[in-house]
């Protein structure tokens, strides 16, 4: 009995030692030089999820939104001066320089989420639903100088949500996700076109320059990120494996991706007992290789990055 207890204790200590060594190695992160712009992200480090901003490469992080109400899904305006975000069915906007916040849509007639700016920096496309439980469609919202907001439906959802809108660089159309496929809708005329098919379940489309889309995907137990040529619809796999990336955002110069890394099937099973990180923001290069952690914690989640100038 004593011998079995001793062997068990040694096994536990060995597992703990291996776990601590793995965590120490996995927490090392040296970011590459020359990272452009700044990143807005969501963190619950101070309680409710709030927006934070960090000018890269090494300025201190700064909180942008305050209060007990959870906010999320930030999108930086084309000129880098403002951030649109979702807040309990409403769309808010915060100015980066001053922290001044305004509410764009009130969440009364429509519950809005997932804002994305058009290139003019004035209009936004959002995922909107009448009430909780109904499918979301895409709407174009246009603020007026008098404070009113015009709204025009772009899509009519079928069974599930039309979600994750991404406006094209020329402002002529919007990419989005419908039933795990990438779609496009033209702002002028509303013509719908399917962009992807096959077995991959796509999510989080973003434009990588004017000629490509980049998106995360899952297929069975595999997950990855693909770049899609808009002219030929050819897919190039940037990364594939057991790491689940929930969202992604290209840098302004297209050399990097800021991604929400949700989990990794290759993480040792004992890591969770030792305080493995929660959802975190990682840096990938344009080839899909991880280059380091941007925002990570073993106590608080960090996620949903968007890159500004």
List each language-model region with its residue ranges.
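Sequence signature of WD/YWTD-type beta-propeller architectures
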Residues: 2-309
């Amino acid at each position: 009995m004593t011998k079995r207890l001793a062997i068990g204790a040694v096994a536990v200590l060995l597992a703990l030692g291996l776990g601590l060594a793995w965590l120490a190695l996995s927490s090392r992160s040296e970011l590459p030089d020359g990272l452009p712009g700044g990143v807005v992200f969501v963190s619950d480090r101070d309680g409710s999820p709030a927006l934070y901003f960090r000018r890269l490469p090494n300025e201190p992080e700064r909180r942008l939104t305050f209060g007990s109400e959870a906010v999320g899904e930030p999108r930086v305006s084309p000129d880098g001066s403002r951030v649109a975000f979702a807040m309990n069915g409403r769309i808010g906007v915060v100015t980066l320089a001053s922290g001044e916040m305004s509410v764009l849509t009130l969440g009364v007639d429509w519950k809005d989420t997932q804002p994305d700016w058009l290139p003019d920096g004035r209009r936004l496309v959002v995922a909107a639903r009448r009430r909780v439980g109904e499918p979301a469609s895409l709407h174009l919202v246009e603020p007026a100088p008098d404070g009113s907001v015009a709204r025009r439906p772009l899509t009519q959802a079928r069974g599930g949500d039309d979600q994750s809108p991404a406006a094209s660089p020329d402002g002529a159309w919007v990419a989005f996700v419908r039933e795990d496929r990438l779609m496009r809708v033209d702002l002028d005329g509303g013509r719908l076109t399917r962009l992807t098919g096959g077995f991959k379940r796509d999510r989080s489309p973003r434009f990588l320059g004017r000629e490509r889309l980049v998106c995360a995907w899952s297929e069975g137990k595999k997950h990855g990120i693909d770049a899609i040529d808009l002219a030929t619809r050819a897919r190039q796999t940037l990364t594939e494996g057991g790491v689940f990336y929930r969202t992604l955002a290209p840098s302004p110069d297209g050399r990097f991706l800021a991604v929400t890394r949700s989990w990794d099937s290759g993480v040792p099973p004992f890591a969770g007992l030792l305080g493995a990180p929660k959802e975190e923001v990682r840096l990938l290069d344009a080839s899909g290789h991880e280059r380091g952690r941007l925002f990570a914690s073993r106590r608080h989640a960090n996620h949903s990055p968007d890159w500004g100038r």
